[in-house]
From Swiss-Prot:
Domain of life: Archaea
GO cellular component, as recorded: plasma membrane; proton-transporting two-sector ATPase complex, catalytic domain
SUPFAM superfamilies found in the cross-reference section: F1F0 ATP synthase subunit B, membrane domain (SSF81573), V-type ATPase subunit E-like (SSF160527)
UniProt name for this protein: A-type ATP synthase subunit E
Matches recorded under InterPro entries: ATP_synth_B-like_membr_sf (IPR028987), ATPase_E_C (IPR038495), ATPase_V1_Esu (IPR002842)
Gene name for this UniProt entry: atpE
Gene Ontology terms, MF aspect: ATP binding; proton-transporting ATP synthase activity, rotational mechanism; proton-transporting ATPase activity, rotational mechanism
Gene3D superfamilies in UniProt: ATP synthase, E subunit, C-terminal, F1F0 ATP synthase subunit B, membrane domain
Function: Component of the A-type ATP synthase that produces ATP from ADP in the presence of a proton gradient across the membrane.
Entry keyword annotation includes Phosphoprotein: no
Amino acid sequence: MEGAELIIQEINREAEQKIQYILSEAKEEAEKLKEEARKRAEAKAEWILRKAKTQAEIEKQRIIANAKLEVRKKKLAVQEELIRSVIESLKERLANLPEDEYFPMLVELTVKAVEELGTDKVVVRSNERTLKLIVERLSEFREKLREALGKDVEVTVGEPIQTIGGILVESSDGTVRVDNTFDSRIERFESDLRATIAKALFG
């Protein structure tokens, strides 16, 4: 009986050892899996953080770029408003030039137009105020043209047109014209005018 008990005890001891070994292996494997899972989780967390930082930086740069663009748009809008204001003030001043300034200017603009047309018979057109001034001083007007051009120019006063001032000069048959009205000259030179105003206003 003692022999049988010893055998049973030995079997139990071996079984216990095997159980302990299996449990130890299982525990070790479990720890290993837990460590691997932790490392994977840390790596994933780090990747998520890196991705979030990258996205945040991209978003930050986008916001900054949009803000700069908006500031530039507003700055350009303010500049445009100021330039338009200066041009409108210029138009208003030209439209209300005193006669002693305006008459010599009309002569000069007409001389340039006649030279460009290459004719000595012209029709002049402008707004009612300007045509009235020319009619009132027509002899003087013709004399000033003769002095500047070195020849007599036959000037006919035509119908009024919509303009703030200046002069539109046509050949007598109306086939060719030179538009030296203030409106037209401002329009022709607006690009240069804008550049000059912008430089004066904003440096």
